[in-house]
């Protein structure tokens, strides 16, 4: 089914207000969830909203909390989220990273005691739209086995890198081949994943999303490489924020909250003039896109470029929402 932006936002806000979230905060939060869904990140927009409400009801998310600055070292700052709403806090932290970058050329904000930020790509995109290179990542609950193991000991720890090209070029990826949100999307659509998503109970690679959702044996992105990347991202976020690690969140909390996040903005225009920047970026993009495709009907594309098309289509024709997801939202 398809719904309008306003209808979707209205449902989000209705649910938030019914949970006694303050009106202005409910409006802002509903807007971000609607924006995320309209942009095509369904797995971390409308699909994720019931989980967000569950954590709100459990007290993991404190809707009226506000982040505070703990430490300032020029271009680097350390903040405490106090378990505030994750996507609203992340937006503020990338804004702060850009403010620091405008003063220093680069801005780094490390955040502790944060909640799930939903679609991490929103914050990289936020920076790139204003001409900055945006980089951010978060640690998470241990929901993936390290390479060679059966038990979950590392997080999917999404990493985002956004470059201010036209359209914006952005990598938004978890350290697993698929996030649990994307596994849900595939399962709801009744299809297998395009590549191996994890391991079955007999240690064989599988493309069945339901199997991996159940046994929690995600495939790390690039096998041992994704496993290693998850570990070092966790270490850096923990150290820069003086916050909780994946191990601490998993062992000491009863759910995924109080995670650690890093937001980086780079004012590239201080390093290169606009004309030269555009020429260099266009050459890179043209060189990649003109590679001969394996399938003539599937032209080579750059990461993130599809979101511009998806957003335009969803604005014009309505936002696709799975029937079961919509029913669940209406029941909240």
UniProtKB/Swiss-Prot annotation:
InterPro entries for the chain: Diketo_gul_Rdtase, Mal/L-sulf/L-lact_DH-like_ah, Mal/L-sulf/L-lact_DH-like_NADP, Mal/L-sulfo/L-lacto_DH-like_sf, Malate/L-lactate_DH-like
Keyword NAD: yes
Superkingdom of origin organism: Bacteria
Active-site residues per Swiss-Prot or TrEMBL entry: 44
Presence of the UniProt keyword Transmembrane in the record: no
Reactions accelerated catalytically: 3-dehydro-L-gulonate + NAD(+) = 2,3-dioxo-L-gulonate + NADH + H(+); 3-dehydro-L-gulonate + NADP(+) = 2,3-dioxo-L-gulonate + NADPH + H(+)
Any GO molecular function: NAD+ binding
Localization per record: Cytoplasm
Quaternary structure annotation from Swiss-Prot or TrEMBL: Homodimer.
NCBIfam families assigned to the protein according to its UniProt record, in alphabetical order: PRK13260.1
Function: Catalyzes the reduction of 2,3-diketo-L-gulonate in the presence of NADH, to form 3-keto-L-gulonate.
Protein name: 2,3-diketo-L-gulonate reductase
Gene source species: Mannheimia succiniciproducens (strain KCTC 0769BP / MBEL55E)
């Amino acid at each position: 089914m398809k719904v309008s932006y306003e209808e979707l936002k209205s449902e989000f806000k209705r649910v938030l207000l019914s949970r006694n979230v303050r009106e202005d905060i409910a409006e802002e939060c509903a807007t971000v969830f609607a924006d995320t869904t309209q942009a095509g990140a369904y797995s971390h927009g409308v699909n994720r909203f019931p989980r967000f409400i569950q954590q709100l009801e459990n007290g993991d998310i404190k809707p009226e909390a506000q982040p505070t600055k703990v430490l300032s070292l020029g271009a680097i700052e350390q903040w405490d989220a106090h378990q505030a709403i994750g996507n609203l806090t992340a937006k503020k932290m990338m804004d702060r990273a850009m403010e620091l970058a405008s003063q220093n050329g680069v801005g780094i904000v490390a955040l502790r005691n944060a909640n799930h930020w939903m679609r991490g790509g929103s914050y990289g995109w936020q920076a790139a739209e204003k001409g900055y290179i945006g980089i951010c990542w978060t640690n998470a609950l241990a929901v993936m086995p390290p390479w060679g193991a059966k038990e979950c000991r590392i997080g999917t720890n999404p990493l985002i890198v956004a470059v201010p090209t036209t359209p914006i070029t952005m990598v938004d990826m978890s350290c697993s081949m698929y996030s649990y949100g994307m596994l849900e999307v595939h399962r709801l659509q009744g299809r297998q994943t395009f590549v191996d998503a994890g391991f079955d109970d007999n240690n064989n690679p599988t493309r069945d999303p339901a199997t991996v959702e159940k046994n929690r044996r995600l495939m790390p992105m690039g096998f041992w490489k994704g496993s290693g990347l998850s570990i070092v991202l966790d270490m850096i976020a923990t150290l820069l924020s003086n916050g909780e690690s994946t191990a601490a969140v998993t062992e000491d909390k009863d759910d995924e909250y109080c995670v650690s996040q890093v937001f980086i903005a780079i004012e590239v225009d201080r390093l290169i003039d606009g004309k030269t920047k555009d020429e260099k970026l266009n050459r890179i993009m043209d060189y990649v896109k003109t590679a001969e495709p394996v399938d003539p009907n599937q032209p080579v594309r750059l990461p993130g470029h599809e979101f511009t098309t998806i957003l335009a289509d969803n604005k014009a024709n309505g936002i696709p929402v799975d029937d079961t997801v919509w029913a669940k939202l209406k029941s909240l």
